[in-house]
Amino acid sequence: MKKSLNEIAQYLGGTVSGDGEVLIGGLATLDDAGEGTLTFLANPKYAAKVATTKASAVLMGTGGNTHGKNAIFHPNPYLAFAKLLTLFYTAPAKPVGVLPGAFVADGVKLGADVSVYPGAYIGAGAVIGDRVVLHPGVVLYPGVVVGNDVTLHANVSVRERCRIGNRVTIHDGTVIGSDGFGYAPDGASYYKIPQIGIVIVEDDVEIGSNCVIDRAALEATRIRRGTKIDNLVQIAHNVVIGEDCIIVSQVGISGSTQLGNHVTLGGQVGVAGHIKIGDNVMIGAKSGVAGNVEPNQVLSGIPVMPHRDWLRSAGIAPKLPEMKKTLSALEKRVAELEAKLAKGE
């Protein structure tokens, strides 16, 4: 499928610079693009590559330097390029129905146009919405509820009674609803606290591969609408993640913590239990959050502090050995002077 630059600009709501009739048959990066492809520039760091790219056209921010190349100007080129990917590339066709080798227990309700691949297991009483895709190895325990237009990739497990909203994608190997880590000490050992709650994943959530979201002890661990979770994330029991949050890889969130809306946690952030993080908070990678965080802050470090303070601290750290030598020399000099004063010299 080929489209003219004018057609693409109209689809995106952008403005053409150069030859609007040039035909585009694919998308590529600045480095790998060739004739007939469209590339994009979203990060000014790579602006110099526009001059050398072999793409037939460049999608870029309004008023950018085209270096004489055909271009589409758009106020948000990154978002525009994402929309183009859905225009130029479609997912492989999927079979419809329950394929041989899948197991569907008694009492399951299947919606219209579902795709259940070989090796998938659906437990008794589960409710599956329309246009749901269950890839090989997916396990839905009894009583699970899955909304419409959901894709569960290979080897995803959703434990008993947990609920998945509409337009949710969960990637390979993730577990939804495993037991929370709850034990009561009895003086000699630990007594397991039964975890009888559930996990609720709301609409338009995407969860990466090999994540674990534990079920609540009594009520619900909840992932609210629009949140995106990267690979290898651990979310403990009773946690509530707000709307449109970004949780990057290897984050760990301890039990009963609550995140507000539009919170971003960078890679490997550790969050203590039973705390609250307000709306619109950004926390830098490898940070440790031990207490409540007020809204509208950018924090980093262990423990977290305002990001600018952390940058100053990080800048000082490499100088500490030399500063210690200087301080030791000054201490020695002060001691010598005090000794002389004591002798009346």
UniProtKB/Swiss-Prot annotation:
It comes from the Bacteria. GO terms for biological process: lipid A biosynthetic process. Keywords: Acyltransferase, Lipid A biosynthesis, Lipid biosynthesis, Lipid metabolism, Repeat, Transferase. Its EC number is 2.3.1.191. Pathway: Bacterial outer membrane biogenesis; LPS lipid A biosynthesis. It is an enzyme of class 2 (transferase). One of its GO terms (molecular function) is N-acyltransferase activity. InterPro entries: Hexapep, Hexapep_transf_CS, LpxD, Trimer_LpxA-like_sf, UDP_GlcNAc_AcTrfase_non-rep. GO terms for cellular component: membrane. It catalyses: a UDP-3-O-[(3R)-3-hydroxyacyl]-alpha-D-glucosamine + a (3R)-hydroxyacyl-[ACP] = a UDP-2-N,3-O-bis[(3R)-3-hydroxyacyl]-alpha-D-glucosamine + holo-[ACP] + H(+). Catalyzes the N-acylation of UDP-3-O-acylglucosamine using 3-hydroxyacyl-ACP as the acyl donor. Is involved in the biosynthesis of lipid A, a phosphorylated glycolipid that anchors the lipopolysaccharide to the outer membrane of the cell. NCBIfam families: lipid_A_lpxD, PRK00892.1. This is UDP-3-O-acylglucosamine N-acyltransferase. It comes from Citrifermentans bemidjiense (strain ATCC BAA-1014 / DSM 16622 / JCM 12645 / Bem) (Geobacter bemidjiensis).
